[in-house]
Amino acid sequence: MNNGILHQNYNSKKFDIIKISLASPEVIRSWSHGEVKKPETINYRTFKPERDGLFCAKIFGPIKDYECLCGKYKRLKHRGVVCERCGVEVEQAKVRRERMGHIDLVCPVVHIWYLKSLPSRIGLFLDMPLKNVEKVLYFESYIVTDPGMTPLEKKQLLTDEEYAEALENYGYEFEASMGAEAIRDLLADTDIESEIELLQAEYEESKSTAKKEKAIKRLRLLETFQASGNKPEWMVMTVLPVLPPDLRPLVPIEGGRFATSDLNDLYRRVINRNNRLKKLLDLNAPDIIVRNEKRMLQEAVDALLDNGRRGRAVTGSNKRPLKSLADMIKGKQGRFRQNLLGKRVDYSGRSVITVGPSLRLHECGLPKKMALELFKPFVYSKLRLGGHATTIKQAKRMVELEEAVVWDILETVINEHPVLLNRAPTLHRLGIQAFEPRLIEGKAIQLHPLVCAAFNADFDGDQMAVHVPLTVESQLEARVLMMSTNNILSPASGQPIITPTQDIVLGLYYITREKEGARGEGKLFSSYEDVSRAYNSGTIDIHAKIKLRIDRQVFDTKGNTYNEKGVVNTTVGRALLLNILPEGLSFSLLNKVLVKKEISKIINQAFRVLGGKATVVLADKLMYAGFKYSTLSGVSVGVDDMTIPDNKEAKIEEAEKEIKQITEQYQSSLITENERYNNIINIWSKTSDEVGASMMDAISKDTVSINGEKKEIESFNSVYMMAKSGARGSYNQMRQLAGMRGLMAKPDGTMIETAITANFREGLSVLQYFTSTHGARKGLADTALKTANAGYLTRRLVDVAQDLVVIEEDCGTDDGLMFSAIVEDGEVKVPLVERALGRTLAADVVTEKGVVLLEAGTLLDENLVELLDDNGIDMIKVRSPITCKTRRGLCAKCYGRDLARERQVNVGESVGVIAAQSIGEPGTQLTMRTFHTGGAASLGITVSDIKVKTAGKIKFKNIRTVTNKEGQEIVISRAGEIIVSDTMGRVREQHKIPMGAVVPLASGKAVEIGDVIATWDPHAQPLITDVAGKVVLEDVIDGITSKHTYDDLTGQQTIEITSISQRTTSKNLKPVVKIVDEKGAELKSIPLAVGAVLNVADDSILEVGDIVAKIPLEGSKNKDITGGLPRVAELFEARRPKDAAILSPCDGMVRLGNRDTKEKQRIEIIDKNGHIVEEILLPKSRHLVVFDGEQVSRGDVLADGPTDPHDLLKYKGLEEFADYILIEAQSVYRMQGVVINDKHIETIVRQMLRKAVILDEGDSKFVKDESIELVRILEENDKLRKQGKKEVEYELVLMGITRSSLSTESFLSAASFQETTRVLTEASINSQIDNLRGLKENVLIGRLIPTGTGLAVRKESAKIEKMREELGVEDNMVFTDLSSFNPEEISFDSIQSQKEDKDINEDIEESLRNALESLDF
């Protein structure tokens, strides 16, 4: 007997690629089931569709299933019969969603997308300006289609008068016409091949870049037409397809009226005008009338395809523009984003959430009524299987009546059946998690408090949605991958995300505090039980200091075990917590005051040492304890808890006195307005801080008498405890409650100079309240804007990274990035240990003695990074997503550790989306503010020296010095740094040293804490000479390039260089200080920048190290620093900053002053032979940081300004660029205290570098200076290498995330992101193919995404497909060999084991793989 089972397989999803192209009139007719000839829709009396109308049943199919229109044929037995009376085929009514019709247009009509979507394809193809094409189309001008023997030119436009004149002169020797027919003829007549040859010749010959660019654009368009098989005349339509009627429905609403889709109106207009035109042509109407009708037909079709693209939009009866076909697919409400990328799903519900303090971490409370509705199908089947009901109908009735048995069955159904909970907005993957439902009374969903952080939920009325996974596979995935107990770590940072907050923290803090002289102090207990008994009987106080004997086993991270035994000093509260501490963790973790950070450490340590299961149990127990003791503590907020300090009034009086003095000084013109304002702001800030400090003193300490002795102890004030423990509130808020509110900001960020001296306990006066509304209101407005902006940033990030998936184990590269600690302002902000964790080494790590510590390819875990630290390694090379060589994906080695799972990332992980979510999710926490570092914000003191914070050795980097006549070492280099390393050689500090600084110590010297290693003048940058000689001033002319000022008080006179813009004449003078020797030969020339103050006079003698001039630093530093969200967006969009720094494009020597123009200065870079290699023109106002004759390397700064990432990549290389983006982006997040792993930012940067520009096309078909996907270039190079031909040379180009998303290989992904019309227009002309590689494309067509379990399924089905081909099985059969099938082999033991204990088991992953392998999708 044959063991194969054959059955029909209606699988419409069996396609690998999707292609989009232009439709020819024949193709449109082949789709159609008939021509729509009348504009009528339905008969007003019978409500039946009119024949040949827009809803005609003959064309589109029957209205009722298997029933013709007149009712002659009914039921399934007549299927396929065409009724001879009404002409309707007996078929299912759903064919009305699929069958299309068509309209035969009397005259051709141009498709508006190819005309008006910029750049106009028709205009470009015909090499005509869009304006001229439109003139012809809309019947304003004639166009010459065939000049014949006349002097007219082809494509020449003629007005009516000119046309009449030409007819008079040449008769019918030439042809000229107007309208779409003319355009169609021109398109059809174009000989593409000869045009291409002409253009190539033109491209080669032309010198101007503009001409070249135009030629290449047109060439590309013609080549696509040649290659794609599209004919250009198809951009002009002669047949218009009609959408199936059920996609543009007409529905009756109450009151006998009808609601209709706008498309019906638009189609009606087209049909009306088309029919009228037909009549007019039959009647041989005058040309002018016909012409007008043709123009109106063109406009009607334009409106149908894309309303509002040209001229005014056609409006409906409600004065709103009608929604055209283009509007149906684009935008948030369009087909792509509304129905294809996100759909409403069945088996879901939503309700308000409340807190479930008694739940376990993997549970949620589900209201009974809701559960019954959600699990209805399961309940029905159980009722039938259990014999309670014989039919579904009966089961339905039982459920409706809510009989007792129904609830029992519901209990068994939901047992072990996870549900998904989701809270909008879902900003990262933890916004949807799986829980096991517990049935509860009431109507609100109960949520476990510890998952609130991941969902960003609170219980002030938030709602959440519940979804039921139906299939076994989906339940398995929910349990293994999405269960809340499996998502302990945040994928963004790798830190625990289920750490306790708020009341839990308060409770744990309260019971771990100690109190002097509490009842039972000093007693010794032998065990936890003794303490518990004594506490419950009331003989000891919970805060009493006691001694406790302990004996526990402790594991460390390396897996070693040691014993912890002996008597420890502790408190009763801490001893009570000992019961919940699992075996393996040290009591020292608990034996301290537990503030939020410490609790987080306990969870972290538990996860590292004991694994997920024990951590989950511990977290739950900590939560129960926290809730219990915060309730028992009775901590609450009362007005008396805010203690106002006694010295507040005195402090305020003192401040007011100082301000009075300053105002008097200002009135007698001793200080400027700016100084007055800054001083007042400073005084109030200082006072406010002092009042705050004395309030903290008052609130944080209590005086108690113990045995008649007065003692100061830490206070048990409720407000203080809340803030101190990290449960709620902050020092700043407390200051406003009990100190003084202080300074308020205006919406533009500046401070209002009248401070609010009252606090909330005293209450504000009307004026004070009014002052404070300013900032408060801005805060609210900001929040609203910020949320939208952050959401948009996330969307752009997801879009650019969505198709980045780990697709192989190892790409084999030894490329990578150099990692060292991140140092800001001389302090190590992020140690190397943190950055290196979870990365793969790209090169061996070698100690100073030359010993190989770790080999390349090692994945660094916690123990290995400690090893790096112990050996004083301060720089390593790690693999990075940016340098990964895998094409169309990433390899697991370059990505490193999966942060949420603590092991190397799995093949199939969609790391792109995770990266995008990790960066976008904290976006809402980032500020929107643009900081102004002038006036109020810069309350910091100016720094003028560097003191060492760690003892060790100093090392100079890029520092050149000269010795002046006082014997001091003066720095004359620009980008110098001093590095302080400790005894192990690890970098502890790194300081930038400005030019002109005095360095008292030499490189390599030992330093102690507090030693000064550099001093400088903070207010001016000195220009210093490194040669001795006589001064000659050139072009320093008083009143023209400089101004003399004489100070009456000091008797000093100064010479200051003035700006070019202030000069009326002599704009080309360049003030310079030249230093010459005795013979008058020039030794050095120093150009003087605007604002420089001279320190030397003409003919004076200079020594080495003398200051020639000083540039005051006031003007240059007051630039705006963009912070927060806008800065992150700016980095990822790779925007070029205004007045960016100019980098040197090559190595060489700088030559200045040659051939300057009126407005610009010219920088020439010359090689050893004196030839000019590069020239740069700059406005004269830009300040150069290089001198004439200075040697520069490629990428050195020539003129300062903000960094341009594009230049950085071009001149300094990939590594410098990657480093810049990483450090800049991280500094924004660090300011807000958000931790994001570097690899997420690197992942996005990889996607920004997807394209490259061709430097030399080699033997390929590419064109020089064209930018193309890097993957395509690499694939082309592989081919050329095999053939032994010349390869393509290229250089990477940087694209912002929006541009990168729009230029992806997949047109479906790009079209569903932004600019849908443009993307589809371009794709259709190119006959573009979408290979459906990314996630988005697969979601759009309703497939499993090729990542995670979907990738496994895809590989599996590829194997099956291969087998089918080898066996020669036809497509419409599924061939299953049952001989080898044994159902008992499929093991679900791991799911069984969960029944014993509901906490997650590691074996499940194995079972998931087995299950997926054994399931043939």
UniProtKB/Swiss-Prot annotation:
Q: Name one GO molecular function term.
A: zinc ion binding
What keywords appear on the UniProt entry? DNA-directed RNA polymerase, Magnesium, Metal-binding, Nucleotidyltransferase, Transcription, Transferase, Zinc
Describe cofactor binding as the record notes it. Binds 1 Mg(2+) ion per subunit. Binds 2 Zn(2+) ions per subunit.
Which positions are annotated as binding Zn(2+) 1?
C68, C70, C83, C86
Q: Name one Pfam family in it.
A: RNA_pol_Rpb1_2
User: What reaction gets catalysed by this protein?
Assistant: RNA(n) + a ribonucleoside 5'-triphosphate = RNA(n+1) + diphosphate
The Swiss-Prot or TrEMBL record lists the needed cofactor(s) as:
Mg(2+); Zn(2+)
SUPFAM superfamilies attached to this UniProt entry: beta and beta-prime subunits of DNA dependent RNA-polymerase
The top EC class, named as a word, is transferase
At which positions is Zn(2+) 2 bound?
Answer: C811, C884, C891, C894
CDD domains given in the database record: RNAP_beta'_C (cd02655), RNAP_beta'_N (cd01609)
Tell me a GO cellular component.
DNA-directed RNA polymerase complex
Its Enzyme Commission number(s) read: 2.7.7.6
Positions that bind Mg(2+): D458, D460, D462
Q: Partners and quaternary state?
A: The RNAP catalytic core consists of 2 alpha, 1 beta, 1 beta' and 1 omega subunit. When a sigma factor is associated with the core the holoenzyme is formed, which can initiate transcription.
Q: What does this protein do?
A: DNA-dependent RNA polymerase catalyzes the transcription of DNA into RNA using the four ribonucleoside triphosphates as substrates.
**Membership in a protein family:** Belongs to the RNA polymerase beta' chain family.
**Entry protein name:** DNA-directed RNA polymerase subunit beta'
